[in-house]
A protein has these predicted regions:
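Catalytic glycan-binding domains that act on GlcNAc-containing polysaccharides
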Residues: 16-150
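Sec-dependent N-terminal signal peptides
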Residues: 3-12
């Protein structure tokens, strides 16, 4: 029974569909901060990871932000999302662009989520596979929830 439920949840992900940047962010945010509705104020990894996307200082630096501070991630969701976008445009421009245009693939979301979790080469690291499975499950859940919504 559990196998059938898992297959039912993941089935929509196997069909050719376009994905959006918002869908990717929503799934990543949920994996990063779980049941916390907005992720604002969430501090993780002994104070090193801040806000809805659990952004570390080196990630913030790599995003090459020209305003704000790393601490701004803690209380500003839009700022945090801008950091993620800049980081992904730097390390995975094609995938990010397709997602921003609403024509992303599941592979695009896999790549950016694994980079988010494991750094610029995160998509090649075995250690980021479990993270990707969590993002993929959340993506499936979100898609199924939107289909069932009135």
């Amino acid at each position: 029974m559990r196998t059938l439920l898992t297959l039912a949840l993941l089935a929509p992900l196997t069909m050719a569909q376009d994905y959006t940047w918002r869908e990717a962010l929503n799934a990543i945010r949920h994996v990063e901060t779980g049941s916390h509705k907005t992720g604002l104020g969430v501090v993780g990894d002994n104070g090193k990871a801040l806000g809805p996307y659990q952004i570390w200082s080196p990630y913030w630096i790599d995003a090459r932000m020209d305003y704000g501070t790393h601490a701004s991630c803690l209380s500003d969701k839009a700022y945090s999302e801008h950091i993620v976008k800049r980081y992904m445009l730097r390390y995975s421009r094609k995938c990010t662009t397709r997602l921003l245009e609403g024509r992303g693939t599941l592979a695009d979301i896999e790549r950016i989520s694994r980079i988010h979790n494991g750094g610029p080469k995160g998509y090649t690291k075995l250690a980021t596979r479990k993270y990707w499975v969590l993002v993929q499950k959340r993506l499936a859940y979100n898609r199924n929830a939107s289909i069932m919504a009135p």
